[in-house]
């Protein structure tokens, strides 16, 4: 959300905003996902493909969980940051791009760097304007606003008629510790919007990580 806000508040707002979650990628496909590949570069590469860097040319690329990038690929990421150049897998030529990088991680990159798991030159290249965001459990005042924003987002995305959440359902969210941080809240709201038959989400619609097999609370007719 912060990355999107940075992009939307900048001169690049009308250009692409591309995201990639490193933690969700197998290491074997990570380089191709970031930088692209040419046809025949590896088994299964039946056609050439642009990577996330090329997709974000002129705009912003948000790299989530950047601390999970292996050392070998960190070298290529550093070159992209330093010189604005990338090289697709299986291609000798380099391409020059204009992409602003916004990176996030839940790991201590300085400690990882000291342990040899993260390049120091890449660390300092990324650490230009650090922004520390407390976990959701430490800023519960944001839960209501985020919940409404996610409801609006997913209602539009999936064409669902959901337009709000009951007070009791919101209270259940406010009490939850959210070990999965904002992503856990987003997933819970997305699932609720998809599965409900109501216009107002109730406690019966909200399922949280520690209680996947039962509903949260009891139905309440009060509305937020």
PLM region descriptions:
Residues 4, 31, 35, 74, ...:
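A short, noncatalytic alpha-helical element within ATPase nucleotide-binding/catalytic domains
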Residues 40-47, 83-88, 111:
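Short gly/ser/thr-rich secondary-structure transition/capping motifs
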Residues 67-68, 78, 207:
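Catalytic acidic motif of RecA-like/P-loop NTPases
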Residues 1-43, 54-70, 135-140, 188:
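Conserved post-Walker A coupling segment in P-loop NTPases
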Residues 16-18, 47-58, 62, 70-76, ...:
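AAA+/SF3 P-loop NTPase mechanochemical coupling elements
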Residues 213-220, 224:
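Conserved small/polar residues in nucleotide/adenosyl-binding loops
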């Amino acid at each position: 959300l912060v990355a999107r806000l940075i992009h939307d508040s900048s001169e690049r707002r009308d250009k692409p905003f591309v995201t990639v979650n490193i933690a969700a990628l197998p290491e074997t496909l990570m380089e191709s996902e970031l930088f692209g590949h040419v046809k025949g570069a590896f088994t299964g590469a039946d056609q050439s493909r642009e990577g996330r860097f090329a997709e974000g040319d002129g705009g912003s690329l948000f790299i989530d969980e950047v601390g999970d990038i292996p050392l070998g690929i960190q070298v290529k990421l550093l070159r992209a940051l330093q010189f604005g150049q990338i090289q697709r897998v299986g291609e000798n030529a380099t391409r020059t791009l204009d992409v602003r990088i916004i990176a996030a991680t839940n790991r201590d990159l300085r400690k990882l760097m000291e342990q040899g798991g993260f390049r120091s030159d890449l660390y300092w290249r990324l650490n230009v304007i650090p922004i520390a965001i407390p976990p959701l459990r430490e800023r519960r005042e944001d839960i209501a606003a985020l919940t409404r924003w996610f409801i609006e987002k997913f209602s539009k995305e999936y064409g669902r008629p959901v337009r709000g959440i009951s007070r009791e359902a919101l209270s259940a969210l406010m009490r939850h510790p959210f070990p999965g941080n904002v992503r856990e809240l987003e997933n819970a709201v997305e699932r609720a919007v998809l599965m409900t038959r109501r216009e107002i989400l109730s406690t019966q619609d909200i399922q949280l990580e520690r209680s996947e097999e039962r509903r949260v609370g009891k139905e309440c007719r009060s509305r937020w």
